[in-house]
């Protein structure tokens, strides 16, 4: 493998328990002992009392580091990735969460795996993001991005939503449902999968639209090109509606507004250990049957 090596490493995450925080500390001292320049996210440095460490925000790490190591679960990775995708930086994850579709490194073997990665032994891929605009005619949009999915849903109390979906400015369908999930291939193994959506392999240039509890027997998931633009229109809004991005950012929708969703210009530069297999990850995480022979 003729991959670039790394000089400056960023350590990122929001540790929720002592074991995750300990992983950050071990990683910091291990990298420093090997002569790497290390930049630590500010809150982590504060929690670990790393008074001599170079610290910075996620944006600082994106601008100055070559590689960001995200310690935590997929939630931590999603939050970091939405920021780091704006910069020319590679990203890898140490799994300190539950499922860990995006965080490959096993915490018990992370240093050995990371050692190989730092020597240039890794697989690289790009994951695209979705960009969401909540807008009103002649007014500035409220904008957010998502790695996994954009979800239309009631704001507080679950209830039926009535809306129309336009794809590339052509009417596609109307729907009465509890909401709509619009997912990337990365997000197709998350909320979308739980709602009955298909799994899209990461290299597919596609987006999937998955209805949530539709009030009809004929509504089905729809896979479209990732170059398409999706527009959601509402005849009237009688109660709270929201668009959520990766279940972390919520944009309220008000009367007279519409929602525009399209592929972002940014992408996440995700890397994996050299022995990574997407289908092995699926089999392991989803409990699929093993090979017969």
UniProtKB/Swiss-Prot annotation:
EC numbers on record: 2.7.1.23
The protein's required cofactors: a divalent metal cation
Major location (coarse): cytoplasm
Catalytic site: 74
Pfam families according to UniProt: NAD_kinase, NAD_kinase_C
Cellular location(s): Cytoplasm
EC primary class: transferase
UniProt: NAD(+) binding residues: 74-75, 148-149, 159, 176, 178, 189-194, 248
Gene Ontology CC: cytoplasm
InterPro entries (UniProt xref): ATP-NAD_kinase_N, ATP-NAD_kinase_PpnK-typ_C, NAD/diacylglycerol_kinase_sf, NADK
Catalytic activity: NAD(+) + ATP = ADP + NADP(+) + H(+)
UniProt-listed GO biological process terms: NAD metabolic process; NADP biosynthetic process
GO molecular function terms attached to this record: ATP binding; metal ion binding; NAD binding; NAD+ kinase activity
UniProt KW keywords: ATP-binding, Cytoplasm, Kinase, NAD, NADP, Nucleotide-binding, Transferase
Entry keyword annotation includes Cytoplasm: yes
Reported function: Involved in the regulation of the intracellular balance of NAD and NADP, and is a key enzyme in the biosynthesis of NADP. Catalyzes specifically the phosphorylation on 2'-hydroxyl of the adenosine moiety of NAD to yield NADP.
Family: Belongs to the NAD kinase family.
Protein name: NAD kinase
Organism: Yersinia pseudotuberculosis serotype I (strain IP32953)
């Amino acid at each position: 493998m003729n991959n670039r090596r790394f000089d400056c490493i960023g350590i990122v995450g929001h540790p929720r328990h002592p074991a995750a925080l300990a992983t950050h500390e071990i990683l910091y001292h291990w990298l420093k002992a090997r002569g790497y320049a290390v930049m630590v996210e500010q809150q982590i440095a504060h929690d670990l009392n790393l008074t001599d460490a170079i610290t910075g925000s996620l944006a600082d790490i994106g601008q100055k580091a070559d590689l960001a190591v995200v310690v935590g679960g997929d939630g931590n990775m999603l939050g970091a990735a939405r920021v780091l995708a704006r910069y020319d930086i590679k990203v890898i994850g140490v799994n300190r969460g539950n499922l860990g579709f995006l965080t490959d490194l096993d915490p018990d073997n992370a240093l050995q795996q990371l050692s190989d990665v730092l020597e240039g032994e890794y697989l690289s891929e790009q994951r695209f993001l979705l960009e969401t605009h909540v807008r009103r005619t002649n007014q500035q949009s409220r904008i957010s991005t998502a790695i996994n999915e954009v979800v239309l849903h009631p704001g507080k109390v679950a209830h039926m939503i009535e809306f129309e979906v336009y794809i590339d400015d052509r009417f596609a369908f109307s729907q009465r449902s509890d909401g709509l999930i619009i997912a990337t291939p990365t997000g197709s193994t998350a909320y979308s999968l739980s709602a009955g959506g298909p799994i899209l392999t990461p290299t597919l240039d596609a987006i999937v639209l998955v209805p949530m509890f539709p009030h009809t027997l004929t509504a089905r998931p729809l896979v479209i090109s990732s170059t398409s633009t999706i527009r959601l229109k509402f005849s009237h809004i009688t109660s709270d509606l929201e668009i959520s991005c990766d279940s972390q950012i919520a944009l309220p929708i008000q009367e007279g507004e519409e929602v525009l969703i399209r592929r972002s210009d940014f992408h996440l530069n995700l890397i994996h250990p050299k022995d990574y297999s997407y289908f092995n990850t699926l089999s392991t995480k989803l409990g699929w049957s093993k090979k017969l022979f």
